[in-house]
């Protein structure tokens, strides 16, 4: 494992690991083009009533949004959990599910799948995306090259 990319607040990495801030972002929702929810911004009740897809590398059915909904006494209908972002836009584009994800990633998905984007209808703080690695790899030229490439890519999304 060379690096881990993720939300620092979710990863909560040990203090001895190296980390680099990449960017801050907010959450957005994507649905297929023509989805009934895009005619107007959905209410919170409409949002939780529609089936959702969740991206979870661990398979957990509790995400950042679910934690906030629980505080509000609500629960969304998670119909499908996938372990990574790769298949998510293609599935959402062919179903009536909602996918909540970082806004910058949602914008990228819209370049290759027929999707519409809208804000998450709950108040969520912005989060920091970071890159984490073991300090033993800190001065490795190949590892430095990889980190530099990841940093450059993140600057452009």
Annotate each language-model stretch with its function.
Residues 7-9, 37-39, 51-72, 139-143, ...:
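Secondary-structure junction motif
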Residues 20, 45, 89-90:
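Alpha-helical segments flanking ligand/cofactor-binding loops in enzyme cores
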Residues 33, 39, 105, 115-157:
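A late-sequence structural motif
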Residues 1-27, 31, 116-118:
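Short beta-strand-centered segments that line the small-molecule binding cleft or hinge
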Residues 15-16, 40-41, 85:
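Structural motif corresponding to alpha-helix initiation and N-cap regions
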Residues 1, 7, 58-116:
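Hydrophobic hinge/microswitch elements
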């Amino acid at each position: 494992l060379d690096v881990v990319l993720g939300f620092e607040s979710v990863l909560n990495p040990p203090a001895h690991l190296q980390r680099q801030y990449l960017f801050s972002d907010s959450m957005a929702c994507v649905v297929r083009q023509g989805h009934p929810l895009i005619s107007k911004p959905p209410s919170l009740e409409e949002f939780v009533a529609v089936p959702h897809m969740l991206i979870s590398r661990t398979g957990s059915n509790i995400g950042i949004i679910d934690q906030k909904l629980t505080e509000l006494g609500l629960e969304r209908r998670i119909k499908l959990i996938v372990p990574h972002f790769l298949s998510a836009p293609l599935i959402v584009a062919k179903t009536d599910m909602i996918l909540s994800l970082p806004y910058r990633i949602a914008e990228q998905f819209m370049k290759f799948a027929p999707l519409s984007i809208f804000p998450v209808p709950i108040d969520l703080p912005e989060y920091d995306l970071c890159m984490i690695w073991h300090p033993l790899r800190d001065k490795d030229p190949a590892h430095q090259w990889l980190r530099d490439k990841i940093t450059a890519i993140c600057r452009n999304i």
